Design a protein with these regions (language model features):
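Single, function-defining residue in the core of a domain
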Residues: 3-16, 21-202
Length: 202
């Protein structure tokens, strides 16, 4: 699964129930996309102020499933709840993330993988939120030259497979682009919360 959200801007004077910024209104379409068929498994429509990470509290995690998400969803207590449910996550590390290395696996740097490590979070509160090992993979993209740092709780899959899983997250960006282009939700038939949500759903 890939988890992300997209924001749809609205006029504050017409949609005052959906505050976003001081002069703007917006709704957010929080979506869990099943990557096996590019079909949404979960959609939640909120006002523009709801932080993405709060959506993790609404999901029922499927044991054995992978949940791929960006840095906006990094909350160690919530990721630990996902871990305890028997599911796996793949995300990018926020900077700076304080962690100590416990173990380093051998890597083939010619593949772009710079390091593959087991780490423990530093800090009293962080360590309480996620008290087990995390896997940290540093990958250098040879095309862009960018170095990406991934976090996962899966210790079995090869490092390159974890990197490829994160790359598959872009399917949800294509899904959002398709929605905005084809479902014509730039023009709403009503201004109430129910009218907007009904139109998005239909």
């Amino acid at each position: 699964y890939a988890l992300d959200s997209t924001t749809i801007d609205l006029c504050l004077s017409l949609f005052d129930w959906a505050p976003f910024r001081s002069t703007k209104a917006a709704i957010k379409l929080h979506t869990l996309l099943d990557l096996r068929g590019a079909i949404p498994a979960f959609i939640h429509i909120s006002d523009g102020k709801l932080h993405d990470v709060n959506v993790l509290d609404m999901l029922r995690f499927e044991a054995g499933a992978f949940y791929v998400m960006d840095r906006g969803y990094v909350d160690f207590s919530r990721l630990y709840a996902l871990h305890q449910a028997g599911a796996f996550f793949v995300t990018r590390a926020k900077a700076p993330m304080s962690a100590r290395r416990v173990y380093s696996a051998a890597v083939d740097r010619s593949t772009g993988v710079v390091c593959d490590q087991q780490v423990m979070l530093n800090g009293y509160y962080s360590a309480r939120k996620y008290p087990e090992h995390l896997r940290r993979i540093r990958f250098k993209d040879t095309e862009s030259g960018k170095t990406l740092v991934f976090l996962t709780n899966n210790t079995v899959l090869p490092a390159l497979t974890i990197c490829a899983l994160y790359k598959s997250r872009w399917q949800i960006e294509l899904f959002f682009k398709w929605i905005k282009q084809h479902l014509r939700i730039k023009h709403f038939l009503g201004t109430s919360e129910n009218a907007v949500k009904t139109q998005v759903w239909c």
